[in-house]
A protein has these predicted regions:
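Active-site-adjacent core segments of small-molecule enzymes
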Residues: 20-507
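Sec-dependent N-terminal signal peptides
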Residues: 4-13
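Sec/Tat signal peptide C-region and signal peptidase I cleavage site
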Residues: 15-19
Length: 507
């Protein structure tokens, strides 16, 4: 009898002795058997009253949320930004208005077109998104590794993505489809030129630069506006893979970028990026041979100085990928006082689309997910929904509306948005007049080394050479020729066109 009691005591102490926790249902009740369903007899059938089985299957059935329509494959990390230059004369944004000021942040790097399980060796732009947890709310810079984009107007974005995604018929990404689209979008020439260099396949996320792509507005305490564009410069250097290196890497480990980033942080080789800004006064915005608020245009450093304002350090890996990376909700509309959107047509569409896709993907309460919560207490009149604030925060809990004779919450007029005066402006629907689609891709091409030019031509030939429609090929070559004569001639020759053919359609 003593032996039986002793065994019972040991069994009862088992979870404590070996540091194991008792498994529970979602309601917190302990589970007796997680290996066998409740059945009629030894062989079944299974009883519907097996609540644990039903709950377990129901939870599993709903595990997968919609993946991002673009930027589905990604990696994330946490760290901080430390300012090194006081920019308060340009912006009242709290993270930029002092020296040696630290702001916690989260970062998500990503590929763009393919799904969550796709290789990180594909030629693709890379997403470079940073969420700053400031004392005045969350501020997101949602950009890419390249300083420009394919299009300048958000109305083209769904069509562009459709062309780059796999065919709805064959489920295969097809150069015939996306070059058909781009042959009718000359503004894409700049982005295509950059993407088909080795920049299109970064060696790892920590080895790529980043850009806000768009210009934004900085606003200071006096309400004065300055246009700003951000650049992240990797302190690890910018390193990429050519075709052979990418093929070799893919044969060994096609998720190398995620693994490399995580290993560096685990090994305390913390990746860093310096943050630079370029500034343009509103009175100077029209003085360039391009429109600076056109997302297909870079801001040349020899014309618009790059000013270092701080450094980002990543020093912490996610503990739970789904909760901290898959669930992070980035948006260029997450702005704080001192930073406002510009008139950039592509940016204007993104301000809506990012918030909208997060509501679809993560639900109405996505900003209450821990990784998306601001440090600043959220206090507003959202009521009776997942997005509502707790009324216990209010001096008058009964008041959830404005205006009211009982002041529960108040605004601060110092945070009002800047004003813009417009004269002789009409509402219209047409493309901008200052397109200048070929000057910058030409300048970029001429800045390349001979090796980089050779790789660019080879990479373009690989995809453009698959296009069956000769007229599409000719239109693309025409764009490259108009950018730079040598560029056009070399790709024409690579695709098998004669000098006579080339000179005829290259004019």
């Amino acid at each position: 009898m003593k032996k039986i009691v002793l065994i019972a005591i040991v069994i009862g102490m088992w979870p404590t002795l070996y540091g194991q926790q008792i498994m529970t249902t979602n309601g917190g009740a302990p589970i007796g058997d997680n290996q066998n369903s409740k059945t009629v007899g030894e062989y079944g059938p299974v009883l519907l009253e097996d609540i644990h089985l039903i709950e377990k299957l129901a939870a599993f059935d709903r595990e997968r949320i919609p993946e991002r329509v673009v930027h589905a494959r990604g990696a994330g990390a946490f760290g901080y930004f430390e300012s090194t230059k006081d920019m308060s004369s340009y912006t009242k944004a709290v993270l930029f208005n002092g020296n040696n000021k630290r702001t916690d942040l989260a970062v998500r790097f990503s590929t763009v077109i393919h799904g969550k399980g796709s290789p990180e060796t594909a030629r693709d732009p890379r997403g470079f998104a940073v969420k700053f947890y400031t004392q005045q709310g969350n501020y997101d810079i949602v950009g890419n590794n390249l300083p420009i984009f394919f299009i300048r107007d958000a109305i083209k974005f769904p069509d562009m993505v459709h062309s780059l995604k796999p065919s709805p018929v064959t489920n295969k990404q097809d150069p015939n489809r996306f070059f058909d689209f781009f042959s009718n979008v000359p503004e894409a020439t700049h982005m295509i030129t950059r993407l088909y260099t080795d920049l299109g396949i970064p060696k790892g996320y920590q080895y790529m630069n980043g850009s806000s792509v768009h210009g934004f507005k900085w606003v200071n305490e006096n309400g004065e506006v300055t246009y700003v564009k951000y650049s992240w410069i990797s302190k690890q250097g910018e390193h990429n893979l050519d075709l052979e290196q990418a093929a070799k890497q893919q044969s060994v480990d096609w998720q190398h970028a995620t693994v490399s980033l995580r290993m560096d942080i685990d090994n305390k080789n913390y990746p860093q990026w310096d943050l630079y800004v370029q500034l343009i006064k509103p009175k100077d915005i029209g003085s360039f041979d391009f429109w600076p608020l056109d997302a297909t245009k870079d801001w040349p450093a020899d014309k618009i100085e790059k000013i270092k304002i701080g450094t980002m350090t990543l020093n912490k890996n996610p503990v739970n990928y789904f909760q901290e990376v898959e669930s992070i909700a980035m948006s260029p509309g997450n702005l704080i006082p001192g930073i406002e959107p510009s008139e950039d047509k592509l940016l204007q569409g993104r301000l809506f689309s990012y918030f909208d896709t997060q509501r679809h993907r993560l639900g109405a309460n996505n900003q209450q997910i821990k990784v998306n919560q601001p440090k600043k207490e959220v206090v507003n009149y959202n009521s009776d929904s997942y997005s509502s604030a707790s009324n216990s925060k209010f001096p008058n809990a009964d008041i959830n509306y404005q205006p009211s004779t009982k002041v529960a919450l108040k605004e601060n007029s110092s945070y009002k948005l800047s004003e813009t005066k417009l004269n002789n402006i009409k509402i219209t629907q047409k493309k901008i007049s200052k397109t200048n689609d070929f000057a910058q891709p030409g300048s970029f091409y001429r800045s390349l080394s001979e090796k980089d030019k050779t790789n660019l031509i080879r990479n373009l030939k690989g995809d453009l050479g698959q296009v069956k429609n000769i007229h599409i090929q000719k239109k693309m070559i025409t764009y490259f020729y108009r950018s730079d004569r040598d560029f056009g001639m070399r790709i024409a020759k690579a695709l098998g066109f004669s000098q006579k053919d080339f000179m005829q359609f290259g004019k």
